[in-house]
Structures are given as C-alpha cells and as structure tokens.
C-alpha cells in the first residue's frame, strides 16, 4: 500500500509542481536567484532546525544522518527511509507607494536513505535556487519605463555516504551535482509625444546554463545524559565550489499584444560575449557551515538551537552585476523543537501525533541600496502517523516577512504551507509464516 501511495504522490504532486515557478519573490532577481531551504517539512516546521536525527526520518542537511542507531524492538534493524515534499507560498508585496499579491507552488525534495550495516547511503534531488519575478518601473506619468522578468533556477542531485563510528557518533559526506538555467529579460518602453507606446519596443535577454560539483560534510553526536535526557549535537561544512556558467545575450525588437502581454519578435541580434569575456564565466559558490545543540527525552520531546553561516561576500556574478547591489556574509539562527503526547499509544490518533514549532532569523547576505535584506519566520507543524507507526504525513505552516520598504525597496509578508510523506519500512525483510 505504501509503495502505491508513493507512486501516486510522485506522479500527481511532483509533476504538477515542476510546472510552476519555484518562487515569486522580486529578490530572486539578484545573484542566481533566491536560495531555497534545504530541509524536510519536519525541519522547516521547527524554524529550520536540522540537528535532530533518528532512524525513521530523512535529514537533508546532515549526511551523517544516513548512519543511525537501530530501532528498539525491530530485531537490530534500520528501515529504508523515503521522503517527498512540496510547498505553496503566498506573499503580499509592499512598497512605499503600492502593494501586490503573488503565489507559487514548488517541489521541494525527493530523497531516499538506505542502511547497510554500519553504513548508510542517501540520494535524492532538491532545488538549490529559484528565479521567478516580474517587475515594472514607472515614470512620473505612471507609464511603464522598464519591465523585468526572470525564471529558472539551480537544482541539486546528490549521492551520500554515512558511517556509524560508535553507537552515538556518525560521520557522512554528500557529493552534489548542481545544474540548471536562468533567463532574464528587460523591455525598455518608448512613447510618442502624446504618451502612447510605440509599435516597436526593445528587449534584452540573458540566459545562463549552469553546472558544477560541490561537497557537504557532516557530523552527528547523540548521548544519554541520564536515564531520561538525551543530548543531541551536529555540525556540517560545505567547502567553496564553482559553478560554470555558459551565457547568451540577445537584443530584440518586439511588438506587444496590449491585452495579453504576449511578446512577438520582429528582429533579433545575438551578442558576441566572447569579446567581453562573458561567454563562459565561473561563479564562486561560497563556503557554508552550521552547528547546533539540543536536549530532549527520546520519543517524547526535544528542543534545540542551530546557527549557520555562509561567506556570501565572496559571491559575484559578472553577467548580472549591479552598482546598487553588494553581497555580505549570510547567517541564520533557528530555535525549535517537537512534542509527542504518547509515542506508543495503542489508541488515540492525536496522542501519537508529533507537534512541532520554531522560529528563525536570517540575514540573506543581499544588500541593496545600502540596506541589508533580512528575513524572519515563525513556524508550526504536525506529523500524522501512518500505517506501521514509523511513517507519517507531515504538514507545516510558516508566517514571516522578508525585506523592507526603506530606500525604495519591497517588503514581503509571506505565508508558506508545506506537505510531505515520510515513509519508513524494511523492504527487503523476508516474511515469516507460522
């Protein structure tokens, strides 16, 4: 039944989500797009906290989680773990002069973890960045001066290995292949003396096809402080890496359908970027690290805190450079936890439900018009038990804000809804009959 459910979920949900833009944030205009949260709905519902690892949930942030202790009462075995998730986001965009509403639906992750002895293997796919915006600048007569549009993003596929060094200490490494494309276009509008748009307008289009490799190293440690309390800690490190960007630029004369906004190319000229050295460029992906610690009672409750940082100040993108934009080091502080009323209850569905909550504060590393772009979010979630008791359907909710209206910028007030299936089972165990 679980296998059939997985197939239906992938076919219906993931395909539909890929047809949508992964973000509708105007801040995805900068760099290589808005950085996507790399983590499960379980993590996201605890303010992004990812240090907690166990034998029945996939952890996308720390590859050491692939090698965990056995489940008590399962005859010394660890299950295969599968997880797939997605989200819907709605945002109110506010400036000093206007407001607008946007929404987006996105596939967030597909992951599988397989234990073999003291080793554990993991592989899957997650979005890394996402671009999706449509912006307009106006003149004093409220006529459109420029229209900016962007789409695309960078995805990650990964293959990881974890090793259980001792009963509570594990180490792991992920190898990532990063790939994707980003397309940005700018239309410059011209008007006649009466303020009527001319028949022909000018458009510049830039496209980048990106690819590269990266690593993520993780360490996880758990130990019992006494008969009830358990200490949990973890750390990760992602070394600096490069993305190769193969670029194209074109200048077009277009006409516009005033009703639908559809663009029709009249004339198109491909720019020779090799002259300026922009035909193929290398983007430096900054190093990143995280560490955290928490305490709790196994299968009952947990609370923890985590800090992550990234040397975003090392990032640059020659093709999309802007004099008003700089990059500074990014960081995130997450605090959260979970509570389970009665994990082994024979009756009472909500007694076995996992209740999660958390809060996070993030410095995105983006500085526009001398204004740092920061983000704040409060999250809640539940894990609803399924079938064998170690699988669950997870629902998450987050409300928060990004950016500011200072210095002619935009503030986003957003609401995010997340859903996932977290499935665990011993697929290769032989059945016994009496």
Locate the predicted segments by residue.
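Bacterial Sec-dependent N-terminal signal peptides
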Residues: 1-25, 434
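Subset of outer-membrane beta-barrel
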Residues: 21-434
